[in-house]
A protein has these predicted regions:
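Local sequence-structure signature of Cys/Sec-based thiol-disulfide redox active-site neighborhoods
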Residues: 2-41
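A generic structural signal for ordered secondary structure
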Residues: 19, 38, 45, 51-52, ...
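Residues at the C-termini of beta-strands that transition into short coil/loop
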Residues: 21, 44, 97
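Non-catalytic interaction surface on structured domains
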Residues: 28-32, 39, 57-58, 83-88, ...
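Pocket-edge positions in alpha/beta enzyme catalytic cores
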Residues: 40-43, 92
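Thioredoxin-like thiol-disulfide oxidoreductase module
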Residues: 44-63, 68-73, 100, 104-107, ...
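Non-catalytic, surface beta->alpha helical segment in thiol-disulfide oxidoreductase systems
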Residues: 71-113
Length: 113
């Protein structure tokens, strides 16, 4: 299914940020998305430990923010800062907040075009 065929599918392109309160990168990312008027849902994993535990187990990382973009129904891309799952194409790695934003915007605008 091509990108254009995905548009209009329920929830495609939705962005969810999984953050923790004392993470400066989390705050920067949220602020930048707000400035760019890109809609997103923020989930503070300190307020929902079950979600944090699930993500840390699934993605084998304890680094935040974790960005999740819904690419299609039941298909997600996770963008995280560090992981041993680099071989999976649904995982993108970033080394700086700028790189995370670049990857995020690439996915976001690909879905919205």
């Amino acid at each position: 299914m091509g990108v254009l065929e995905k548009i209009g599918k329920k929830g495609v392109g939705e962005i969810t940020l999984y953050t923790i309160s004392d993470c400066k990168y989390c705050q920067t990312l949220k602020g930048t998305l707000q400035e760019l008027r890109i809609p997103f849902t923020n989930i503070d994993v300190e307020q929902n430990e079950a979600v944090g535990d699930y993500l840390e187990s699934k993605l084998e990382t304890e680094y935040y923010p974790i960005i999740c973009i819904k690419k299609a129904p039941e298909e997600y891309t996770y963008i995280i800062s560090e992981t041993n799952l680099e071989k999976l194409n649904r995982i993108r790695i970033f080394n700086s907040i700028e790189e995370a934003l670049e990857i995020l915007l690439e996915y976001y605008y690909e879905i919205q075009v």
